[in-house]
């Protein structure tokens, strides 16, 4: 019994001192098997320095069983160490390096994502289809397009017909205080057209718009002719319009003479005839 116990004790001591390894050539990798010990390894500063030098400078990432034995034999000069401690140190160091690279990649990815703040947000532009013009205001038109010019006491309403397209832009046509015109709404006194606002297009075709434009121009021409005729009639009326209803079929007596039908007699002759008729009546 004693020789068997001595042989078993010598085998255990030899295994602890040399750190017997087992190489798995079939899988292409290496694994190191050793007897587990209850004591925890506390590496010294020199041991850590040698291991980092092998890992970073010499490029040793996955050492084989022979390399682990040589490394552990060298490190025992600086403190207590086993072969399994060398094996696990390289495994843990590789895992930490992979985790560090993954964290760095995720950090750069989040840094490249643009962040949108509230002060960077710009609301879309809002265009008012129905423009209201207050009295005494001078609305400005963008992009050089002409608009309305209103004077105090005026009001223009637009009820969904869009902007009136005029062929002759910047055409002024003043309207008297007693004349009212409907151009998509109501227009009062002291309003002048100075242009058009082409910001919104007519939803109808160009042909319909052209017809409407021509009809509008013809309406303006008819109004101008009516104003000229009205002015001419005012100039030819007699000074006293109340005598215009007097019929000229009766005889007019003046200065001892008889004349029939004198529509354009002078004021003196008209008065004499009127007094003469009243005397005989």
Curated annotation (Swiss-Prot):
DNA-binding region range list: 36-101
Region (Disordered): 1-38
Main location, first listed in the record: nucleus
Composition bias, Low complexity: 1-25
One Pfam assignment: Homeodomain
InterPro entries (alphabetical): HD, Homeodomain-like_sf, WUSCHEL-like
Top-rank lineage group of the source organism: Eukaryota
Entry keywords, A to Z: Developmental protein, Differentiation, DNA-binding, Flowering, Homeobox, Nucleus, Transcription, Transcription regulation
GO biological process: cell differentiation; flower development; plant organ development
Cellular location(s): Nucleus
A GO MF term: DNA-binding transcription factor activity
GO cellular component, one term: nucleus
Function: Transcription factor that plays a central role during developmental processes such as early embryogenesis and flowering, probably by regulating expression of specific genes. Required to specify stem cell identity in meristems, such as shoot apical meristem (SAM). May induce shoot stem cells activity in order to maintain the stem cell identity.
Family: Belongs to the WUS homeobox family.
Name of this protein: Protein WUSCHEL
Organism annotation: Antirrhinum majus (Garden snapdragon)
Organism taxonomic ancestry: Eukaryota, Viridiplantae, Streptophyta, Embryophyta, Tracheophyta
């Amino acid at each position: 019994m004693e020789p068997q116990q001595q042989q078993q004790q010598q085998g255990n001591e030899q295994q602890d001192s040399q750190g017997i390894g087992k190489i798995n050539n079939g899988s292409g990798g290496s694994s190191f098997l050793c007897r587990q010990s209850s004591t925890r390894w506390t590496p010294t500063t020199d041991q850590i320095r040698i291991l980092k030098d092998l890992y970073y400078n010499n490029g040793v990432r996955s050492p084989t069983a022979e390399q682990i034995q040589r490394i552990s034999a060298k490190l025992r000069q600086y403190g207590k160490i086993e072969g399994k401690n060398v094996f696990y140190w390289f495994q843990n160091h590789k895992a930490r390096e992979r985790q560090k690279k993954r964290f760095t990649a995720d950090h750069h990815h989040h840094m490249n994502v643009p962040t949108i703040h509230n002060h960077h947000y710009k609301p879309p532009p809002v265009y008012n289809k129905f423009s209201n013009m207050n009295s005494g205001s001078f609305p400005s038109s963008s992009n050089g397009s002409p608009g309305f010019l209103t004077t105090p006491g005026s009001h223009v309403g637009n009820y969904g017909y869009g902007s009136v397209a005029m062929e002759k832009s910047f055409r002024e046509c003043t309207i008297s205080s007693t004349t009212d015109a409907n151009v998509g709404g109501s227009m009062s006194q002291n309003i002048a057209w100075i242009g058009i606002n082409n910001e919104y297009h007519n939803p109808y075709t160009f042909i319909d718009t052209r017809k409407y434009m021509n009809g509008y121009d013809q309406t303006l021409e008819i109004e101008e002719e009516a104003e000229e005729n009205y002015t001419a009639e005012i100039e030819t009326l007699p000074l006293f319009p109340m005598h215009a209803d007097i019929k000229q079929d009766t005889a007019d007596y003046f200065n001892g003479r008889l004349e029939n039908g004198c529509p354009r007699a002078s004021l003196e002759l008209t008065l004499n005839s009127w007094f003469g008729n009243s005397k005989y009546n």
